[in-house]
């Protein structure tokens, strides 16, 4: 995040070491405030739940295991706090009330510096015009006295209308008064409203209601981001938001499968007719029949800047000429700033809502979302939702698979790409995967096996006789396989590439096995765990789901595995290490049992071409024919520093096709 977005004093703030002074009755309180704005919460104290709810509003969660939580107060978290109505005095007094120690002077000064000007002026959209609301006349006078702002305002006795919104927003940041955007949708008589409500059978959970209360206040809608674990009902939160605003809504997803699921869920939970909820994908080019409705599309469809078919261009023109009440952004964490700026500039909208499970990236671009979309409105505690039965309880395992001598000998001398495939195709890992599938199918589980490597995905699935989905799999075939997995008692295991990482709803799945992954991506690890958190049987007594990550011993996989697990460990999950599975060797019919079979497998790996070594990201890139920069952005890999690749550019050799 560019520091120009921060108050000038906050940019220069230092945190000198200070002595922690305990209160006389400190044992009655639940949190410690360190001199560097780190807060440690003891969850076993009597008032810890109230303290935790407050900390979520003013600080970033760092780590939340069972008994001790860590939070960090940042300029961005304080921006979010004042955006939802907390004042400087509210923050200071409540923090002091829960604290065991006297608040360090540097922390108090930092809070004051960050919140003194934040939240004091609002940009309100009323009657299709932009107005400024100030906390008091002194602040309003300061704005009007600024020459740049004054030249872009239309001031009357009753209101201050903004003429050039972007210029005023930029100038307000420069003078330490960033604008908070609110949409007065109830008084918007210019945009058409349409009849859409939740069905009487649709039930909203308490934490979902809390999310929505943060977004809607005094009859207005705030732009911002809501963070909920996979499987906890992010989609329903978005659907409830659009039924509250009741204006035309544009929903952006990461994939065509996600588009279908958003459409199905919206029709399931609301009374909308199928004619007014439409899709814009490479397969469907639809528009609603009434004056307003819902369009669901993907980020890449909207950001694509090549030549479109006449039918697609017609829909794109309609999207750009429509004024949208709500822009709903699913899986908001995976799309970097450049794509968001493009998407946001393409469409006229009044309110933005971002939904995500993991507000984390391996680069430093996640903070861009604070100002491109809005502040974080709410973030849930995974373990709290698990304890209440809203998401499933999970047992996580890291399974170490020893490399055979021949495979490891080649591993030590091959290129980085071949090394990676050798560690994935390790015969011991094959056997471990086969054993775990057999064991869990016998228990009645539905199993998802993930592999980033397309070559390994096909090899495992074909060898074990299981269906698989990856980039080139057609949309119809994808939906057919997923339907069979959900309903057919004979189809209990499917293999997925990284196309299944996000937005695939499979509540039947109760076991996940990961045979390869994207290096050290914490986000991907959490997203994959999320595929089994929504298990239908989660409320059954003693029911648990299982997450296995198979890694080849003494390879780079072990190094990346610890990095990947960090986010989940911070959410309170623990990984049990399985160093060996002796039961594997009791199966006389196990795959690649003999030396000759293992040698054949090794030869096939060594003879693999560069094309076969590609991950599914690259395969998808060629399949849909978009610029590499767009696709890397939409998958969240842009800027990550975990890859070592050969110098090559196959993309330039491929022609792009029309969308």
From Swiss-Prot:
It comes from Vairimorpha ceranae (strain BRL01) (Microsporidian parasite). This is General transcription and DNA repair factor IIH helicase/translocase subunit XPB. SUPFAM superfamilies: P-loop containing nucleoside triphosphate hydrolases. It catalyses: Couples ATP hydrolysis with the unwinding of duplex DNA by translocating in the 3'-5' direction; ATP + H2O = ADP + phosphate + H(+). Keywords: ATP-binding, DNA damage, DNA repair, DNA-binding, Helicase, Hydrolase, Isomerase, Nucleotide-binding, Nucleus, Transcription, Transcription regulation. Component of the 7-subunit TFIIH core complex composed of XPB/SSL2, XPD/RAD3, SSL1, TFB1, TFB2, TFB4 and TFB5, which is active in NER. The core complex associates with the 3-subunit CTD-kinase module TFIIK composed of CCL1, KIN28 and TFB3 to form the 10-subunit holoenzyme (holo-TFIIH) active in transcription. It holds the Pfam family ResIII. The gene is SSL2. Residues 431-589 form the Helicase C-terminal domain. A motif (DEAH box) lies at residues 330-333. ATP-dependent 3'-5' DNA helicase/translocase; binds dsDNA rather than ssDNA, unzipping it in a translocase rather than classical helicase activity. Component of the general transcription and DNA repair factor IIH (TFIIH) core complex. When complexed to CDK-activating kinase (CAK), involved in RNA transcription by RNA polymerase II. Also involved in transcription-coupled nucleotide excision repair (NER) of damaged DNA. In NER, TFIIH acts by opening DNA around the lesion to allow the excision of the damaged oligonucleotide and its replacement by a new DNA fragment. ATP binds at residues 228-235. One of its GO terms (molecular function) is DNA binding. The keyword Nucleotide-binding applies. Residues 215-377 form the Helicase ATP-binding domain. It comes from the Eukaryota. GO terms for cellular component: nucleotide-excision repair factor 3 complex; transcription factor TFIIH holo complex; transcription preinitiation complex. Coiled coil: none annotated.
């Amino acid at each position: 995040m560019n520091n120009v977005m921060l108050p000038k004093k906050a940019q220069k703030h230092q945190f000198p070491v200070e002595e922690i002074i305990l209160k006389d009755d400190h044992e009655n309180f639940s949190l410690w405030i360190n001199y560097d704005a780190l807060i440690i919460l003891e969850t076993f104290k009597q008032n810890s739940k109230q303290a935790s709810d407050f900390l979520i509003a003013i600080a970033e969660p760092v780590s939340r295991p069972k008994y001790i939580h860590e939070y960090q107060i940042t300029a961005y978290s304080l921006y979010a706090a004042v955006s939802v109505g907390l004042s400087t005095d509210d923050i200071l007094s409540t923090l002091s009330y829960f604290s065991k120690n006297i608040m360090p002077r540097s922390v108090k000064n930092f809070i004051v510096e960050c919140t003194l000007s934040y939240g004091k002026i609002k940009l309100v959209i009323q009657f299709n015009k932009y107005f400024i609301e100030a906390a008091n006349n002194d602040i309003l006078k300061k704005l009007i006295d600024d020459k740049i702002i004054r030249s872009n305002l239309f001031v009357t006795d009753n209101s201050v209308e903004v003429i050039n919104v972007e210029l005023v927003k930029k100038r307000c940041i420069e003078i330490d008064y960033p604008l908070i955007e609110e949409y007065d949708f109830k008084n918007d008589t210019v945009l058409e409203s349409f009849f859409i409500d939740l069905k009487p059978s649709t039930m909203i959970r308490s934490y979902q209601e809390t999310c929505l209360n943060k977004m809607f206040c005094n009859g207005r809608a705030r732009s911002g981001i809501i963070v909920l674990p996979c499987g906890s009902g992010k989609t329903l939160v978005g659907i409830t938001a659009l039924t509250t605003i009741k204006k035309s809504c544009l929903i952006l997803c990461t994939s065509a499968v996600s588009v279908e699921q958003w459409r199905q869920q919206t029709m399931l939970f609301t009374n909308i007719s199928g004619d007014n909820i439409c899709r814009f994908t490479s397969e469907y080019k639809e528009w609603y029949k009434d004056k307003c409705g819902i369009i669901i599309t993907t980020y890449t469809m909207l950001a694509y800047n090549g030549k479109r078919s006449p039918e697609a261009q017609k829909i794109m023109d309609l999207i750009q000429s429509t004024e949208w009440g709500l822009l709903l952004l699913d899986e908001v964490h995976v799309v970097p700033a450049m794509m968001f700026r493009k998407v946001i500039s393409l469409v006229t909208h009044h309110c933005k809502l971002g939904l995500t499970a993991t507000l984390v990236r391996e680069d430093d671009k996640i903070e861009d979302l604070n100002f491109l979309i809005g502040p974080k409105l709410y973030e849930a505690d995974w373990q709290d939702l698990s304890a209440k039965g809203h998401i499933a309880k999970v047992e996580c395992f890291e399974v170490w698979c020893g490399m055979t001598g021949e495979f490891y000998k080649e591993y030590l001398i091959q290129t980085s790409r071949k090394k990676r495939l050798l560690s994935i195709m390790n015969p011991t890992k094959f056997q471990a995967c086969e054993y775990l599938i057999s064991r869990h199918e016998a228990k009645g589980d539905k199993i998802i096996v993930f592999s980033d490597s397309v070559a390994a995905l096909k090899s495992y699935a074909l060898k074990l006789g299981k269906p698989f989905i990856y980039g080139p799999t057609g949309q119809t075939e994808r939906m057919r396989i997923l339907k069979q997995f959900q309903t057919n008692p004979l189809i209990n295991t499917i293999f997925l590439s990284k196309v299944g990482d996000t937005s695939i709803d499979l509540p039947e799945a109760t076991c996940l096995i990961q045979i390869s992954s994207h290096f050290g991506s914490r986000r991907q690890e959490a997203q994959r765990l999320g595929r089994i958190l929504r298990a239908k049987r989660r409320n059954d007594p003693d029911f648990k789901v299982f997450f296995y990550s198979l890694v080849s011993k003494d390879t780079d996989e072990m190094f990346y595995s610890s990095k990947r697990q960090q986010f989940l460990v911070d959410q309170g999950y623990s990984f049990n290490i399985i160093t060996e599975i002796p039961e594997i060797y009791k199966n006389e019919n196990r795959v690649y049992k003999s030396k000759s079979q293992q040698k054949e497998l090794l030869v096939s790996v060594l003879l693999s071409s560069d094309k076969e070594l590609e991950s599914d990201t690259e395969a998808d890139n060629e399949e849909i024919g978009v610029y590499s920069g767009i696709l890397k952005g939409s998958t969240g890999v842009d800027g990550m520093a975990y890859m070592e690749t050969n110098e090559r550019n196959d993309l330039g050799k491929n022609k792009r096709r029309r969308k």
